[in-house]
């Protein structure tokens, strides 16, 4: 008996993002074989998005790029960014998911950032590099991320992306409720 296959393209080659997409889809579609592939996709926004708006647009741009490049059932893009809110600076990620002619946007949890980290970002650095320097790590953005470091491993960048993907999939799981 041949198993049904769902092909997923992720707008990044970062293993954290690819694994989050694969894990979320495996949870949502346990009776399917999930084939997940990452590809480089331009965000069209600064390398370190500093606003909610730029972060969201980066995810949308990546997902649209992927749709134009290769055939798949679902297209995922995750864009991490920072912004300064009324309660202080925080990092978060937007998730853009395309399926057929529909687009769903979701956002991961907000992680409060130390002011010294935010100031380094305002000066032009990227969050992963700042965290590597602060915690003496190497390429943390392809591992637990700032989330893993600041929560002492109780949450990770991947776990945040996985949850955000599952939530952003709601319109595709319940299409009758999202006309």
From Swiss-Prot:
Gene3D superfamilies: 3.90.950.10. Its EC number is 3.6.1.73. The keyword Plastid does not apply. It is an enzyme of class 3 (hydrolase). Binds 1 divalent metal cation per subunit; can use either Mg(2+) or Mn(2+). Keywords: Hydrolase, Magnesium, Manganese, Metal-binding, Nucleotide metabolism, Nucleotide-binding. One of its GO terms (molecular function) is nucleotide binding. SUPFAM superfamilies: ITPase-like (SSF52972). It comes from the Bacteria. Substrate binds at residues 71-72. GO terms for biological process: nucleotide metabolic process; thiamine metabolic process. The keyword Magnesium applies. InterPro entries: ITPase-like_fam, Non_canon_purine_NTPase, NTPase/PRRC1, YjjX_NTPase. Homodimer. Phosphatase that hydrolyzes non-canonical purine nucleotides such as XTP and ITP to their respective diphosphate derivatives. Probably excludes non-canonical purines from DNA/RNA precursor pool, thus preventing their incorporation into DNA/RNA and avoiding chromosomal lesions. HAMAP family: Non_canon_purine_NTPase_YjjX (MF_00648). NCBIfam families: inosine/xanthosine triphosphatase, PRK05074.1. Belongs to the YjjX NTPase family. This is Inosine/xanthosine triphosphatase. It comes from Shewanella sp. (strain ANA-3).
